[in-house]
């Protein structure tokens, strides 16, 4: 009986390539978060959440990157350039979306605790709100 080759199996489809990217991205994030946890910089919960977000983001970016490289085709340089550019854009968009979602959740939590929202505070740099002598 032949041994099962996971990498070969996953590389046969674009979603499989995305899973492989998620495994690699999640592994890198876990290694980073374990060091941060040992230094006392983050909690276990924060490490788990960040590792999950990074794994999903890397998997998504890898999937979109593999698809784009396949659509564009071309030679090695064009395919690699396309894959790299699309992966960077995909991961950037994922991270931006996560930051926005976390900010909304923090604002909602702040409101539930009876605090003001950031939108309630006047903008100190708004020229219309400055007093004129």
Swiss-Prot record:
This is Magnetosome protein MamC. It is a multi-pass membrane protein. Probably helps control the size of magnetite crystals; in vitro synthesis of magnetite yields larger and more well-developed magnetite crystals in the presence of purified MamC. Binds Fe(3+). The lumenal domain probably binds magnetite crystals, affecting crystal size and shape. Purified MamC self-assembles into micelles in the presence of ferric chloride hexahydrate (FeCl(3).6H(2)O); both oxygen and iron are present in the proteinaceous micelles. Whether this is relevant in vivo is unknown. Signal peptide: none annotated. It comes from the Bacteria. It comes from Magnetococcus marinus (strain ATCC BAA-1437 / JCM 17883 / MC-1). This bacteria makes magnetosomes having a pseudo-hexagonal prismatic crystal of magnetite (Fe(3)O(4)). The chain crosses the membrane at residues 6-26, 68-88. Residues 27-67 are lumenal. Keywords: Biomineralization, Iron, Magnetosome, Membrane, Metal-binding, Transmembrane, Transmembrane helix. It is found in: Magnetosome membrane. Belongs to the magnetosome MamC family.
């Amino acid at each position: 009986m032949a041994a099962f080759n996971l990498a070969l199996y996953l590389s046969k489809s674009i979603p499989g390539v995305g899973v492989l990217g998620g495994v690699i991205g999640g592994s890198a994030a876990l290694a980073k978060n374990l060091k941060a946890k040992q230094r006392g910089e983050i909690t276990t919960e924060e490490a788990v959440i960040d590792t999950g977000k990074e794994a999903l983001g890397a998997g998504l970016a890898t999937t979109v990157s593999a698809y784009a490289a396949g659509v564009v085709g071309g030679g090695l340089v064009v395919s690699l350039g396309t894959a790299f550019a699309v992966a960077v854009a995909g991961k950037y968009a994922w991270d931006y979306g996560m930051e926005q979602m976390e900010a909304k959740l923090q604002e909602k939590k702040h409101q539930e605790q009876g605090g003001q929202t950031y939108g309630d505070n006047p903008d100190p740099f708004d020229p219309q709100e400055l007093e004129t002598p």
